[in-house]
UniProtKB/Swiss-Prot annotation:
<keyword id="KW-0699">rRNA-binding</keyword>
<keyword id="KW-0694">RNA-binding</keyword>
<keyword id="KW-0687">Ribonucleoprotein</keyword>
<keyword id="KW-0820">tRNA-binding</keyword>
<comment type="similarity">
    <text>Belongs to the universal ribosomal protein uL16 family.</text>
</comment>
<dbReference type="GO" id="GO:0019843">
    <property type="term" value="F:rRNA binding"/>
</dbReference>
<comment type="function">
    <text>Binds 23S rRNA and is also seen to make contacts with the A and possibly P site tRNAs.</text>
</comment>
<dbReference type="InterPro" id="IPR000114">
    <property type="entry name" value="Ribosomal_uL16_bact-type"/>
</dbReference>
<dbReference type="InterPro" id="IPR036920">
    <property type="entry name" value="Ribosomal_uL16_sf"/>
</dbReference>
<dbReference type="GO" id="GO:0022625">
    <property type="term" value="C:cytosolic large ribosomal subunit"/>
</dbReference>
<dbReference type="InterPro" id="IPR016180">
    <property type="entry name" value="Ribosomal_uL16_dom"/>
</dbReference>
<dbReference type="GO" id="GO:0003735">
    <property type="term" value="F:structural constituent of ribosome"/>
</dbReference>
<dbReference type="GO" id="GO:0000049">
    <property type="term" value="F:tRNA binding"/>
</dbReference>
<dbReference type="InterPro" id="IPR020798">
    <property type="entry name" value="Ribosomal_uL16_CS"/>
</dbReference>
<dbReference type="InterPro" id="IPR047873">
    <property type="entry name" value="Ribosomal_uL16"/>
</dbReference>
<comment type="subunit">
    <text>Part of the 50S ribosomal subunit.</text>
</comment>
<dbReference type="GO" id="GO:0006412">
    <property type="term" value="P:translation"/>
</dbReference>
Length: 137
């Protein structure tokens, strides 16, 4: 699963997830992309589940790019522990997603196959998504 090799600090504050994605909002590497239309947090497990769904559907053809990375640690206290005594330990990692962010990209497959593969990946995502194509100038 995806997570940073090392970080400056083990734990982070919650912070807000506002605004639109001004970076990473265009299809850069592939021909087709899966773009988020709502905001949320995607865990490393969900990113991997989406990647597997896409790669199983396209079989051997095509190339996949994952355009997001889970770099935010989420902490949790154990069950039945009283409040206080410090912040809990890191349980999992998430990527914060703003509307407009491209999650996955694909190339080397037909558009219909790409649409079906992204539909399967979208079913595993906690955010609403849409299919986008590369803009040719």
């Amino acid at each position: 699963m995806l997570q940073p090799k090392r970080t400056k600090f083990r734990k982070q504050q919650k912070l807000r997830n506002r605004g639109l994605a001004y970076r990473g909002n265009k299809v850069s590497f592939g021909e087709f992309g899966l773009q988020a239309t709502s905001r949320g947090r995607i865990t490393a497990r969900q990113i991997e589940a989406g990647r597997r769904a896409i790669s199983r559907h396209i079989k051997r053809g095509g190339k996949i790019w994952i355009r997001i990375f889970p770099d935010k640690p989420i902490t949790q206290k154990p069950l039945e522990v009283r409040m206080g005594k410090g912040k809990g330990s890191v349980e999992y990692w998430v990527a914060q997603i703003q509307p407009g962010r491209v999650l996955y990209e694909i190339t080397g497959v037909k558009e219909e196959l790409a649409r079906e593969a992204f539909a399967r990946a979208a079913a595993k995502m906690p955010v609403q998504t849409t299919f986008v194509e590369k803009q040719v100038m």
